Amino acid sequence: MQLREKELDEAHFLEEAKKIKELCDRYHVPFVINDNVDIALEIDADGVHVGQSDMEAGDVRAKLGPDKIIGVSAQTVRQALLAQERGADYLGVGAVFHTDSKADAADISHETLKAITEAVDIPVIAIGGISKENVSELSGTGICGIAVISAIFAEKDIKNATKKLKKLTEEMVEA
């Protein structure tokens, strides 16, 4: 579970992070904070995810220590290799389809996605515009999972949408 909230001020972000951390701990779900190392440290989050214009993975590792999860966004093989070299535990790669959730996200080809998965030794998570209608198109790219927002939160029945997308993703990854 990753908390990515760009609109909240620091105090409200901290309040939200504490509530979500409590839920994640209850259900044994790792909790990663997007781009805010200080709040991750304050609430003892399981890790931090940073983008290309955020703090470098090596600096995040120095602040968090060896046991926390560090994820890095990447759009190229070069960025992916550099993130791995600097201590990233996983990569978030995309946008693999057009997305409205992140206006500045540039689409990457599935060929680039596959090249990234072949170049690195750490897990690659595809992100961006993924839905139950298109997740199977990622088969053969080498990803180990997906990250979504709208695919579940835009649905009326979030629980059912999550179950269905999880099943489709597992089938796609195993194919």
Task: Label each residue range with its predicted role.
Residues 13-35, 52, 57-75, 104-132, ...:
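Alpha-helix-loop-beta-strand connector modules within alpha/beta enzyme cores
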Residues 5-9, 37, 150:
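Structured beta->alpha junctions
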Residues 43-45, 50, 73-114, 118, ...:
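Glycine/Thr-rich beta-alpha phosphate-binding loop at enzyme active sites
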Residues 2-12, 95-102:
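Glycine-rich, proline-tolerant flexible connector loops at the mouths of alpha/beta enzymes
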Residues 15, 22, 38, 78-81, ...:
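A broad detector of short, well-ordered amphipathic alpha-helices
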Residues 52-60, 92-104, 132-135, 139-165:
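Glycine-rich phosphate-binding active-site loops on the catalytic face of alpha/beta enzymes
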Residues 2, 32, 49, 71, ...:
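Conserved beta-strand positions in the central sheet of alpha/beta enzyme cores
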Residues 26, 36-39, 43-46, 63, ...:
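Alpha/beta enzyme core
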